[in-house]
Amino acid sequence: MCIRDRLKHNEMLPRILSCTALILDIIILAVFFVSSRINADVDSMAYTDVTGINNKLAYQNHIIRLNNADDTFLVGVIMFDLNNLKRVNDTLGHEMGDRYIESFSAILAGVQNERISAYRIGGDEFCVILEKTNAVEIHQILDSLERKINVYNEKNNIKISYAKGYEISTREHYYLMEELTKRADSRMYENKRLMKGKRLDGRRLNV
C-alpha cells in the first residue's frame, strides 16, 4: 500500500467507525423497541380475559393495590352475574353460551375510564371497581348499562339478563376491600333471588 492509499485509509477509518457505531445504536434501539412491544403484549395477554375484558388476575392486582393504599374512601364495587347461562349452554350449546358472555363483556367494557375498571372474575361473574365515586355516578352507570342492554336485546333473539349489586366505602360506612366486595356480592345475590325464574326468550343469539 502506498503512502497516498494509507492516508486515504486513515481518513476513512473514523468515518467507517462512526457509521458502524450509528448502525449499532440503531440496532440496539430496534431491539429495545421490539422487546418493549413484546413485553407489553405479554403483560396485556396476562391480564386480559378471552372475551377481551380484564381478567381475574388483573382484578386481584387491583384489589391488592387498593388494600395497600392509604384508604378505600369513595371506592365503589359493582358485582354482576349473568342469568340463564346454563340454559343457553344446555339448549343452544356452549358456543352460544360463549357468545352470550362475550356480548355482555363487550357492553360492560364500555363503562371503563381512568377511574373505572371492568373485570370478568368467573364464568358468568363480572365486577366493576370505581375510584373516587359516589352513589349518583354508580346509578348513572347502571342506568346507562341497562339502556345499552335493552338496545342489544331489541336486536337479538337471546336476551341478556343479569343480576347486580353494589356497595361504596364512605365516611359513614367505611369498608376495606374484602368487606366491600362481600357486601356488593351479597346484594347481587339478593337481586338474583328476586329475578329467579325469569325465562330465556328466543332460540338464537345474534351478535
Please give the residue ranges for each predicted region.
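A short linear hydrophobic-aromatic micro-motif
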Residues: 114-118
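PAS and PAS-like sensory/regulatory domains
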Residues: 158-163
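Signal-transducing coiled-coil linker helices
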Residues: 9-49, 57-67
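Catalytic-core segments of nucleotide cyclases and related cyclic-nucleotide turnover enzymes
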Residues: 139-146, 150-154, 168-200, 205
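Short beta-strand-to-loop capping motifs
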Residues: 128-133, 168-170
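Conserved long alpha-helical elements within nucleotide-processing catalytic cores of c-di-GMP signaling
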Residues: 43-46, 54-76, 83-109, 119-123, ...
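Cofactor-binding loops of NAD(P)H-dependent oxidoreductases
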Residues: 80, 167
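Short, small-residue-biased leader/transition segments that mark boundaries at the very start
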Residues: 1-3
